[in-house]
Amino acid sequence: MIMATITLKGNSIHTAGELPAVGSQLPAFTLVKSDLSEVSPADFAGKKLVLNIFPSLDTAVCAASVRRFNKEAGERGDAVVLCISADLPFAQGRFCTTEGLDNVVPLSVYRSPEFGLDYGLTITDGPLKGLLSRAVIVTDASGKVLYAEQVPEIVQEPDYDKALAALA
């Protein structure tokens, strides 16, 4: 099985699978919105996407990434930002409502454990085993991957500048 090695506070942990390659088509998925409806990439057809993927909104770095992408999406308006985690849809909805974040679409993988494997992001060992690692994937309007970053240290934020530059 293909694995990536990343770190959590300097300690090595692993993920199963492989991050989608730049130039490939975004793998299919079915994820759950905060109203419990299901969505897939087809629901965003014709739009550029930023997939902001992370372990849980209940961590400072994950919450910071959602706030930052919400701000950037509001200023740009040229892409849909999907914030994807294993948090339950209720918690995601509450977080976004409380924080006033209305420029991102929170999505839960709780019904779709295969998402993490298909995207190479399921953590397979260590204290966060079973959650998703931190990554950002950017696609064009046809679903072609333009940028993919699996953040090498989970407690670090993604490279926002590179991700947003891929939208240009």
UniProtKB/Swiss-Prot annotation:
Stored InterPro entries: Redoxin, Thioredoxin-like_sf, Thioredoxin_domain, TPX, Tpx_CS, Tpx_Peroxidase_subfamily
Active site: 62
The protein, known as: Thiol peroxidase
Self-association and partners: Homodimer.
Signal sequence range: none
Keyword hit for Disulfide bond: yes
Entry keyword set: Antioxidant, Disulfide bond, Oxidoreductase, Peroxidase, Redox-active center
SUPFAM superfamilies referenced in this protein's UniProt entry, alphabetically: Thioredoxin-like
Annotated S-S bridges: 62-96
Gene: tpx
Note: The active site is a conserved redox-active cysteine residue, the peroxidatic cysteine (C(P)), which makes the nucleophilic attack on the peroxide substrate. The peroxide oxidizes the C(P)-SH to cysteine sulfenic acid (C(P)-SOH), which then reacts with another cysteine residue, the resolving cysteine (C(R)), to form a disulfide bridge. The disulfide is subsequently reduced by an appropriate electron donor to complete the catalytic cycle. In this atypical 2-Cys peroxiredoxin, C(R) is present in the same subunit to form an intramolecular disulfide.
NCBIfam families: PRK00522.1
